[in-house]
């Protein structure tokens, strides 16, 4: 006789927990969205790079062209004099400086 009210109370408790968590999660989402994407001044353009598949960086330049142009450039290492590709320059300098310290 007491099993049915206890079961209903448990279902109500779980429903209330789910509702509160959903509401707080949604409120957090709306708050973050309004803080990051909100445009309070209509004269200032909104800079966003949230479009899926966007190839533009924050300066509206094509990311793929920038990657290929910098990676294809070669820089000379001042420690050993070798020519290193731009994409590997930081790693090389790190190793080169470690060798020099030893």
Swiss-Prot record:
An example molecular function term from Gene Ontology annotations: transcription coactivator activity
Swiss-Prot/TrEMBL keywords: Activator, Chromatin regulator, Metal-binding, Nucleus, Transcription, Transcription regulation, Zinc, Zinc-finger
Entry's Gene Ontology cellular component terms: DUBm complex; SAGA complex
Keyword hit for Iron: no
Main location: nucleus
Compartment list: Nucleus
Residue intervals of every SGF11-type zinc finger in the record: 75-96
Top-rank taxon: Eukaryota
InterPro entries: SAGA_su_Sgf11
GO BP annotations listed: chromatin organization
Disulfide pairings: none
Keyword Zinc: yes
Any Pfam family hit: Sgf11
Domain statement: The long N-terminal helix forms part of the 'assembly lobe' of the SAGA deubiquitination module. The C-terminal SGF11-type zinc-finger domain together with the C-terminal catalytic domain of UBP8 forms the 'catalytic lobe' of the SAGA deubiquitination module.
Job of this protein: Functions as a component of the transcription regulatory histone acetylation (HAT) complex SAGA. At the promoters, SAGA is required for recruitment of the basal transcription machinery. It influences RNA polymerase II transcriptional activity through different activities such as TBP interaction and promoter selectivity, interaction with transcription activators, and chromatin modification through histone acetylation and deubiquitination. SAGA acetylates nucleosomal histone H3 to some extent (to form H3K9ac, H3K14ac, H3K18ac and H3K23ac).
Protein family: Belongs to the SGF11 family.
Entry-linked HAMAP family: Sgf11 (MF_03047)
Subunit architecture: Component of the 1.8 MDa SAGA transcription coactivator-HAT complex. SAGA is built of 5 distinct domains with specialized functions. Within the SAGA complex, SUS1, SGF11, SGF73 and UBP8 form an additional subcomplex of SAGA called the DUB module (deubiquitination module). Interacts directly with SGF73, SUS1 and UBP8.
Official protein name in the record: SAGA-associated factor 11
Upper taxonomic lineage: Eukaryota, Fungi, Dikarya, Ascomycota, Saccharomycotina
